Amino acid sequence: MLKKYQTLLLPLLAAISGLVLGAIIMFIFGYDPIWGYEELFYSAFGNIKSIGEIFRAMAPLIFTALGFAVASRAGFFNVGLSGQAYVGWVFAGWFALLNPDLPRPVLILGTVVIAMVAGGIAGAIPGILRAYLGTSEVIVTIMMNYIILYSCNYIIRDVFSENLMKNTDSTINVSANASYQTEWLRALTNNSRMNIGIFFAIIAVIVVWFLLTKTTLGFEIRSVGINPTASNYAGMSAKQTIILSMVISGALAGLGGAIQGLGTFQNVYIQSGNLDIGFNGMSVALLASNSPLGIPFAAFLFGTLSVGAPGMVRAQIPPELINVVTASIIFFIGVKYIFELFLNSKKVAKGAK
């Protein structure tokens, strides 16, 4: 019975353990953890606008988490989600700024396609290097993050035309036709920044789940991730599958970046560092055990922590401590074999009886 629910229990235990460890750390430093968590969850769920902001924060995380999950199923540890998301944001935003008067359906579809193409190309590069040269994907994707970061910053500052710029570091806002925000969602959520990106994310979850579990390509991705040599003997192309999985991974991350840019911020601006949605997306995927259907629930938790963190100030707790809670959750994901050992020992003990 425990094994049947182990996939669900382990992430749940990791999340609860992270919250408990966060509470212990707050207590050690002289803060009231109960009051802190009360304010955190009140800030996250106390009004409809905050709930809208949770769904706004979820959408890009779902996309980057799905991207990480696809690559992981192929045995590829994609640390380059931040760069892939940023390049998707920049090129989708550029297209939107250059064509402000196109019909809304054309602009939205155009930004989606361009973001996915840009992210897919960024993902293909480390995939090709891994498949044909055997390079370490971790090192390559980390370095790609910085190559893309500074290249995109250069494009914004020196390539974008002056009429697109509000100042040296930021563009003007995209037109209403290109914005992922809608009047009816703003009215529904009391002017939150919730946008159509959340609906794209739900569709993506279903598509990726179907791809990985019900298609030949999904079987090949999982097979290559388990044993590329055996997959080659079975007639599959491990190299082609690795590259294709990274293209899909990068495309998903690129669309996540576009949703962050055109849904949350409405413009394009120079970044001082890698996008948070990349590394947080990795955390979401790990918490969900790379399950497409589990990712929205993990993203909801991270969205709640993100939106509720400022409320901890009312409990006189530095909002930065929410990062400690998040890190604690990831820590317990990393040592989840302890939970597995515990659950398995229960099973063995039961069998011995």
Q: What are the functions of these language-model segments?
A:
Residues 31-35, 72-89, 129-140, 220, ...:
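Short, non-helical or kinked segments that cap or interrupt transmembrane helices
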Residues 141, 145-212, 351-352:
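Transmembrane helix-bundle core of multi-pass membrane transporters
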